[in-house]
């Protein structure tokens, strides 16, 4: 028996390993290479490297049918009383200097500041640089954070003010995000912590923390934070659908007494918008997969009765 909360966390490409453990490659192929060649075409790539794959026409339907006899799908919403989830997209408009710097880096893969030089030699590195720049600072080659703008910090503080004292779980992506957020929060007199261990979990649930900051990778699994608040603020988004969904489930889980509001700070025209789109696209893929397998629940229940 194999259990997973996100069967295709980053799209259908992730399914092969899980199904291979169940059937030894009978349904989707003996190797990941065979699986990719049969069901996917290269998507984003350069001359030497393939960064991602896109399903061929009909692949989703074939895969669903192929694994339907050994998989059943159950969502927590189907058997638990779950609170409502509300998504709030907060647009962040870069000021003129920040927008100019962003466009320059995107166009030339090179950004010069008075404090040093930052290079982005590959698409993957460029993506990271642009996400950093959306957030307001960028690491140089020596891992020094160069501050570029305060636009997203200001938007974050506005959202926090609108919460009117309600507690917030804040997810950041880069260490310089955390450091700049801490500096911005310091004058406000709020009880702020960066999540490190169960002592922080206990203090949050006891109502002793106004703002709990965390990287989604550090608390995406196993933490029960539903008693400490019902607002999530994504200061810096991540590409991983699994990390994103699991992080949101720290508050959106059984025992939460309020609707969970998930605020996304999204730089207009920036890489943030691409991340939101990618998360939504992967989510749609996963929802389609889960829906198609749902019929197995009914069949399994009928077989057990």
Where are these regions (language model features)?
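A conserved SF2-helicase RecA2
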Residues: 239-305
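A short helix-turn-beta junction within AAA+ P-loop NTPase domains corresponding to the substrate/partner-engaging
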Residues: 16-31, 230
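Inter-lobe coupling linker of SF2 helicases/translocases
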Residues: 2, 27-145, 149-166, 262, ...
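A short beta-strand element within the Helicase C-terminal
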Residues: 17, 224-237, 261-264
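PAPS/PAP-binding and catalytic site of the sulfotransferase fold
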Residues: 11-22, 62-66, 103, 181-184
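Conserved helicase ATPase motor motifs in RecA-like P-loop NTPase domains
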Residues: 1-12
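Conserved helicase ATPase core of P-loop NTP-dependent helicases/translocases
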Residues: 169-171, 179-219
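Short beta-strand segments
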Residues: 36, 91-92, 131, 167-174, ...
